């Protein structure tokens, strides 16, 4: 049984050169490759130049950015937003997405709201590393994008792609990356992939996560919002 573990607002990025055209686009919760929003530390920094740089990257007007930062820090202070921009509750993620990232003038329309889920049996592996929900929700029927192999390290997730472990896997298995580089292999194949790279790249446990598209327009059955 897969259970939801959190929600992210992320913009897919072009495949980095070091991945050697693994996929045209990459969508992952790993901050080494993609940026997730909002970023609590960028909102709370006392460095005004850094904060202004962040505002401009988001394409927000000054007052809008002030409101955005205040809301971000409120959620962070209430343990509803984690250090890596992970929303613990879907409603919070949807509210921020609709207010600041959906069809907003000047804001990049390519942002996606995604959910990640993992086997319930694996939850204990993360209990001492992440803020946990008081209740674990089961995944609902929604658009499945594919699987990612992730580990939690210090303050955020890393994907197996960070260490180019896809090269090792491709020597032994057939990987089936989809549009965003997420794997369309079976659950059983993903478990085999995770086992094959244990203790490789990072000295922690690799786990297969299911990734879902929770972007509001997609959830309503229409086209995924935004063009990349």
Descriptions of predicted regions:
Residues 2-83, 101-111, 115-120, 130-180, ...:
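Short aromatic-glycine-(Arg/Gly/Cys) micro-motifs in beta-strand/loop hairpins
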């Amino acid at each position: 049984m897969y259970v939801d573990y959190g929600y992210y607002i992320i913009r897919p990025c072009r495949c980095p050169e070091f991945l050697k055209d693994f996929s045209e686009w990459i969508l992952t919760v790993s901050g080494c490759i993609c940026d997730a929003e909002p970023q609590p530390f960028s909102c709370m920094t006392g460095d005004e130049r850094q904060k202004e740089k962040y505002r401009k990257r988001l394409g927000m007007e000054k007052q809008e950015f002030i409101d955005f930062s205040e809301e971000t820090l409120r959620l962070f202070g209430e343990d509803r937003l984690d250090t890596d921009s992970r929303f613990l509750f879907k409603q919070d993620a949807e509210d921020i997405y609709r207010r600041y990232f959906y069809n907003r003038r000047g804001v990049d329309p390519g942002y996606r709201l995604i959910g990640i889920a993992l086997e319930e049996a694996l939850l204990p592996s993360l209990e001492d590393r992440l803020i946990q929900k008081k209740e674990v929700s089961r995944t609902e029927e929604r658009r499945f994008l594919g699987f990612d192999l992730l580990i939690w390290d210090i303050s955020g997730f890393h994907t197996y792609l960070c260490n180019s472990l896809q090269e090792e896997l491709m020597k032994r298995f057939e990987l089936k990356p989809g549009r965003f580089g997420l794997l369309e292999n079976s659950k059983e194949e993903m478990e085999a992939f995770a086992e094959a790279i244990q203790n490789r790249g990072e000295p922690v446990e690799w786990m297969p996560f299911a990734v879902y598209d929770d972007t509001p327009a997609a959830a309503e059955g229409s086209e995924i919002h935004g063009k990349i």
